[in-house]
Amino acid sequence: MADVSTSEPIVIDLPGGESIEVNNSHWTEIASADWNHLRDDGFVQWTQTICRHEYGRILVYVVLLPTSGILKTAGEILPAGTDVTDAVERLAQRFDVPSNVPYSCIQRYRRALRESR
């Protein structure tokens, strides 16, 4: 699996051609799920993550490491308090993420919200 939790920043591609670096002190991971799959030509790895910015915005993103080894990313920044479900599912569809990954990520996010109250 791609180690997206390292100290190296990951550049997430956002809509409109913008991008953002994550894995810094401004974004706190709330929930994450990952999966890898062996194909004839090697492993494919998916990671889906939900982070909260220090000012409350939410970043939902997916990282795909295909057998080519070229990292692909996509993400969306949502206003504070927005339901993340649609964004998580939309991004998962973009990279054919197995359904257990967005499901687990959403469930972990909801659990984290309940525990923080």
How would you name each of these model-derived features?
Residues 1-38:
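Short, charged/polar N-terminal "headpieces" of proteins
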Residues 24-58:
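Amphipathic, interaction-prone secondary-structure segments
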Residues 58-68:
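A short, structured beta-strand/loop element
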Residues 66-117:
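Mixed-charge, Lys/Arg-enriched low-complexity segments
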